[in-house]
Structures are given as structure tokens and as C-alpha cells.
Amino acid sequence: MSDPNGLTWAATLVSLAVAIPTAGHAVIYKRDPRSATLWVLLIALLPLGGSLLYGLFGINRYQRRARRLFPGADPAVRQDLAPTMPQAVSAPFAGLAHLVGRATGQSLTSGNRIEPLVDGEQAYPAMLAAIESARHSVALASYIFDSQGIGAQFVDALRRAHERGAQVRVLIDDVYARWRPRSAYRALQRAGVPAATFNPTLIPARLHAAHLRNHRKLLVIDGETGFTGGMNIFSPYWRPDAPEQACHDLHFRLRGPVVAHLMRCFTDDWCDTTGERLSKGFWGEPPATADEQGTSWARGIEAGPDEALDRMRWTFMGALSAAKHSVRIWTPYFVPDQPMIAALSTAALRGVRVEVLTPANGDHPTVQWAARAHYWQVLEHGVRIFERPGPFDHSKLMLIDGQWCCLGSANWDARSLRLNFEFNVEVYDTALSTRLESLFDAARDASDEISAMALRARPLAIRLRDGVARLFTPIL
């Protein structure tokens, strides 16, 4: 017969052997001391269970396969991008331009033309037309890519591009590609289109990073035209039979040197996923003319839980510090942490007009409850918050003083700022910013302003529910 005491001692030793180094990892590597404390307490209470949870959800870093396989620069998309300070950037934004350049290691590019595409009604036809026009290559990355409705049209367009000889690569985040029954991943495979899923959740070596997702939306045609923004390929954003019921979003078409930053981002993600390094020939011949396409100075910002950690946070906080007159934030999820709350409040207290526009009808109730639990912390310092009624609004945009804007995939929540791979573009262009301010103002004017008094007047049960949801903001 086995000795119960011996088994107990063995189990205790195993628990300690696992729990002690796990707790040590949390103490050394977790950046937030409150987070480290909570993990250590959980591991102390549940040595094996807490250690397992920490291994799955507590290690928020991702080892880049692309960096390991190909540490050198790819001449197709990686040129000398040491940050420089163009004279075209006005003095109030020189510090911000320097900050983002230091954070990203990329220079501002001139001569870009950036065009906003409002909702699926404008974005999807423009993207489909670009795919149909592709001569050399199509590179598409999407967080969600449905196979039905508008997604079926994209699958067909990609299949036709592949069949006429263009090189096509499609990258979809694994969670949505593998676990959604309507994902386009299998439809693309059946059509013979080269497709892959980012960070597969079924690979044991990557289980610790299963919650780190690729939220980027990129489309590059022939290395000349790019699209990025907040738009997934998803039927709720395409309702030609009832356009008033379609969800809202903002996407952008880009031409000019900044498209190389989209190419670089896709190249790294594709190589990281498949091991295939896209060569210079993949993108086709460079444009025959070097004439400038437009007047925007722009720079791509890759951010994620790898070497690019915190780039988006630094950009947002730097922009808030640079603001002199106005800050407009358009986001589907407004769940800022304490440093971001302090930066927003500081800007408002300096006399800057700070406005936040977010949907009244969210697609994730828990996130919306947590967001409303944060409202009072910025409202009391002069930040104004507006909730847009009607269909869900997935738009993502930041505007400063009518001169600078930041567009792309990132939200104002912990998942975008720390856990997801995101891609944004910062743009210095008064004309574009003015146009985008008009879009923001129109949506804001159709929205309801939230007051601190109204928040306090809500039933206690609702406030408790929201407060409990707020406890989970680090992972929402």
C-alpha cells in the first residue's frame, strides 16, 4: 500500500517546485506591481492552478519567429528608417514626432495621399476594386474574415487574383479563423488561395500566448496602394438592403511611401506565421514615377506584446501632452488605465477641450460596463464623453488641434495597448485632420452627452455591476 503521508509530501514538493519559480517570474517581470501582487497571491492560494493560469494568461510577451529566422533587414521593405525630423512638422508637434520616431525607429514619410472611407458602404467596394486591379500581389491581414455575405465577395476576388497570376497571401487571426464556423479560412483553402492563421492556439509551445491576438487590418496591392483602419471583413458592416442598420467604422486608403510601413508589418507577421520571407519580387516593380502622391506626412506604428510593447501607449500619451486646443477620441472601447486617465485629465485641466465618442450600444456588454465604471474619473476633470446611439460604432481615431491624427486598429483599452498586435498610422496634415474633424463632429452631434450626475443617479445594482466588470479591465 502507498504511504498517504509520502504522497502528500510529494504533492507539496511538486507544488512548491512549480509555484516558487512562477511567483518569482511574476515578481521580476510584471510591470504593474498590483498585477504582480495579485498573481503572487493567487499562486500562493492555488499553487498548481494559479501557476497554470499564470502560464496561460500572465506572460504577456510574444517571441517573434521572424526576428529569430531573419534578424537582418529585408531590402524589399526595410530601408534605413532612422528617425529624422522634417521641417514640415510645426513646432508644437516636433516633440511628438521625435517621440514616435524614437519609439518606432521609423522616419516620417512625405508625399502620401490618405483618403477616409466611411463605413462598409465606402470601404468594401474600394478594397474589392483594388484586389480586382492587382497585377503582381495582394497581401491581406484581418482579425475577422467571414465567408458569407461581403466575405464571400472577398473570397471570390482573392481567388480570381490568384488564378490570373497575382501572388496572394491572406493572414487571419487564429481565434476567429479556426473557431468561427463562418470563417473564410477554409473557403480560401478550398479556393487554392495561400492563407494562414496567426498564433495558432492549438500549438502547445504557444499556449502561454493564446490570449495575444493579431488585431491588425492591412491590405496592400502591388506594393503601391494600402488600406488600413478598423474595418474587419464582416457582414454586420455591409447591409445594402438596409444601410441604416449597418454597423459603423472608419477605414483608409493610402498611397505613397508610407505603404512600405504596411508592407513591413505584413511581411513580419507572415514570416512569423509561416516561415516564408516575402522577397522584393513579391510586391512587383516599384511605381514608374517618383512623383509625390499627396501632401501628408505619415508614419506607420506597429505595436504589440513583443519588441513593440507600449508603442501605442507612448504615442497616445505623447499626443495628449502635445495638445494645445483640442483632443477628439473616437473609439468603440473606452477602458483607459490609470496612467491614461491621468493624461486625459491633465489635458482637460490645462484647458484643452477633450471629447470622447463611443457607442451607446456595445458589442461586448462586459467591456461597456467596465467603460462606464471609468467615466466619472475623467468627467470630474472636464473631459466630455458622448455615446452614439443606433448601430454599433467600431471607428477608431484620435485628432489633435486640427493638425495631427492617428488612425488604425487600436482601441483605448488594455487589450489594444498591451495584449493585441495593432497597426496605426500617425498623420501630420491639416487638410485631412479638418476633414476627419467634420466626420467626428457630425457623429458627436448625433450622440448623447454623458453627465456625472446621470451616472450617479443610476440604480445601485447597475453601478455595482459596472464596478465588478471594471476589476477585469486588465484582460478585457
Feature locations, PLM:
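Catalytic-core elements of nucleic-acid end-processing and repair enzymes
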Residues: 396
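Helical hairpin unit composed of two closely spaced alpha helices linked by a short loop
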Residues: 323, 333-355, 359-360, 364
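N-terminal localization/anchoring segments of enzymes in phospholipid and broader phosphate metabolism
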Residues: 1-314, 318, 322, 346, ...
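Active-site-proximal loop->helix
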Residues: 368-369
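Active-site donor-binding acidic/aromatic loop of nucleotide-activated sugar
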Residues: 385-389
